[in-house]
Every structure is written in structure tokens, then in C-alpha cells.
Amino acid sequence: MTSIEDLISNPPLLLHSSLSQLRYLILSEGLPISEDKQQQRTRCYVWTVLSQTSMEASTQRYLALLKLGPPSTTIYQKIKNDTSRTFQTDPNFRNRVSEDALIRCLSCFAWQTQQRRQKTRFGRIPVSTYVQGMNVLLAPLLYSCPSEPMAYQLFTKLCYEMIPTYLTKNLNGAQNGAKLLDISLRIIDPKLSKFLSDNLLTAEIYGMPSILTLSSCNKPLDQVIKLWDFMFAYGFHMNILFVVAFLVKMRSKVFKSDSPVNLLRQFPDFDADEIIRLGVGFIAKIPAQIYDLLVDHLTDPDIYIP
């Protein structure tokens, strides 16, 4: 049994000290990438503990939503258009996760969001029933969890509580994320930032897929999963600094490229440990007020970044 498995098997899971210890173990030891069902269950359980997601009655709630059938034709067609393209070229994902599973989860989310909207109190962030990219956000959860209801429960926690501003109709949180990516790159690598700016390449042009999907649009998926291990532990705001790390890793190719925009459309395969090391190292260079914006822009719809 690993240190992580030993820790999560003990009773006081949600005590502050236990969470701190679990976060440290994620940083120092990490979770292995494995096809083994027990390892898959461990990762899902760790994500559940770190995000403080209750799985109580999750299967019953999921089945109740499934009984409602497909959502409206408009939403259902949007879902179908995207799920058919989800990680099409990744055989490991396709072998483990069916398109039907993606459709079921996203359809349930559309229904649950409509139900929440009917009960909405004034001031709650209006998460959309479906926005493009939700399929790619859901994919790592279905890939990593041993059951659909568990993946769905984590997905709702992620969407409603952890990154709600990214999933509004106008994607205002993701747009703020793009502005923060520009600002962070300017601080960390002024030369690369100026080069991209001179070529009229703002983060809103090249960075939105990685921002909106929390880097799950990048390859390979097993390395994305390791990034998510870290972000469940330390916060999904770290994704912005991870995207900066992707750019810094590519900088020499970007400078030499005749078409940097094409190069930036798909980041190359990466090693998660290296991206995490770089991203964590950048924190010391980021002014406190900018770091606070990185943290808050995921959940605060009123943040304005010029």
C-alpha cells in the first residue's frame, strides 16, 4: 500500500491536516498511471477527497436524471456534435470510455442545470446547460473514475463550484483567464510575450482551448491526468501557469516558426512532472495581487481585468 492509499484509508479524511498531508504526497510521490482498476479507484477517491465531493446517493441521483431522457433537441445536437470528436485519436480513451457515456453524463448535466436554474437565488453564477468544451472537461473524469455516477458527481462539483465562471454563456471567466495568461507570460518571459504580441497573438487567440478545458485538450491523456492530480490538490488556477510553462517549453520553436499561430494551435506532447515543476517555480515571480486574480477568476464573475 502506498502512502497515499494508507492516508485515504484512515478515518479523518477531511481534517485540515489530513488534506494538507494528502496534497504534499501528491506533490512529492504522485499517483501512478495504471490500467489497474484499484489504481483507478484510488485516483478517483483522492480527487473526491481533495475536492470534498460527497458521493452519497450519487448513483440514485444520476439514475433519476437519466430517466428524464435526452435534453432539448438543440442542446442534445450540440452535445452529439462534440462527443463524436472527443479524443478520437486516443485508443486508450476510446477503449475505456464510450461516446454513449459522454452523452449520458452531459445530458444529465443539462437537465440538472435547468433544474438548478429554476431554483436559482439571485446572484448565483449562471452556468450554462452546455458549452463547447464541456465534453473535453468531462473526458478525464470518465477515464479516471470506475463508474459513471462517480465521474458525473465530480464533474458537477468542478462545473458548479470550482470553475463556474468558465461555463457561463459568455465564458467571461475563461476570457479573464486569457488576460491573466497574457499578464503572466509578460512577467515570466517578456521576450516571448513581446514576440507573440508583435505577431498579434494574444492568449484569447491561441490559449482558449487549454484554458477552457484545464489543459485536457493536450496530449497525452495520461500526462493530463497527472496535471489534474496536482490541480485537484492545489487549485485549478494553476492551469494558467501550466499553459505559460507549455509556451516557455516551446519558445525556441515559436521564435523560429514561419507561422507561430499554427504551431500554437496544438501544443506538443509533454511531460507533466516538467510542466508542474516549471509552473510551481513561476509562482515566486507572480505579484501577490496577480496571483489573487488567478485564484479568484475561476469563481468570481465580477472580476474585471483590463
Swiss-Prot record:
Coiled coil: none annotated. Transmembrane segments: none annotated. InterPro entries: Rab-GAP-TBC_dom (IPR000195), Rab-GAP_TBC_sf (IPR035969). Keywords: Cell cycle, Cell division, Cytoplasm, Cytoskeleton, Mitosis. One of its GO terms (cellular component) is spindle pole. Residues 37-235 form the Rab-GAP TBC domain. GO terms for biological process: cell division; mitotic spindle orientation checkpoint signaling; negative regulation of protein localization to mitotic spindle pole body; negative regulation of septation initiation signaling. It is found in: Cytoplasm, Cytoskeleton, Spindle pole. Part of a checkpoint which monitors spindle integrity and prevents premature exit from mitosis. This cell-cycle arrest depends upon inhibition of the GTP-binding protein TEM1 by the BFA1/BUB2 complex. Interacts with BFA1. Belongs to the BUB2 family. This is Mitotic check point protein BUB2. It comes from Saccharomyces cerevisiae (strain ATCC 204508 / S288c) (Baker's yeast). The lineage of its organism: Eukaryota, Fungi, Dikarya, Ascomycota, Saccharomycotina.
